[in-house]
Amino acid sequence: MIKAGFDSKDLAKRGESLIRQASNRYLTTVRIAFRAKQRRFDDFDGLLEESSVKPVQRSIIELSDEQDQPDLLPG
């Protein structure tokens, strides 16, 4: 899913893509922050494996993947 040695340029491109394709930049920023907060608490609860990727970085990658590959989402 998310590799520990990710490229910072790729992360920046993903973040820019999220903001660029958003109808509301503020809500996109809030979604990223909320997802990061969830991941942080999941890390504390031991629900996620130990990772060197910070929660904000992980949330940008996850939201970008969801945006680029909507067919992977349930429902």
UniProtKB/Swiss-Prot annotation:
Keywords: DNA-directed RNA polymerase, Nucleotidyltransferase, Transcription, Transferase
Listed GO biological process terms: DNA-templated transcription
Keyword Isomerase assigned: no
Role of this protein: Promotes RNA polymerase assembly. Latches the N- and C-terminal regions of the beta' subunit thereby facilitating its interaction with the beta and alpha subunits.
Highest taxon of the lineage: Bacteria
Source species taxonomy: Bacteria, Bacillati, Cyanobacteriota, Cyanophyceae, Synechococcales
Protein's recorded name: DNA-directed RNA polymerase subunit omega
Class of enzymatic activity (EC top level): transferase
Keyword Nucleotidyltransferase attached: yes
Catalytic activity, EC: 2.7.7.6
GO function terms (MF aspect): DNA binding; DNA-directed RNA polymerase activity
Record HAMAP family: RNApol_bact_RpoZ (MF_00366)
Swiss-Prot/TrEMBL catalytic activity: RNA(n) + a ribonucleoside 5'-triphosphate = RNA(n+1) + diphosphate
Subunit structure: In cyanobacteria the RNAP catalytic core is composed of 2 alpha, 1 beta, 1 beta', 1 gamma and 1 omega subunit. When a sigma factor is associated with the core the holoenzyme is formed, which can initiate transcription.
Any one cellular-component term (Gene Ontology): DNA-directed RNA polymerase complex
Family, as annotated: Belongs to the RNA polymerase subunit omega family.
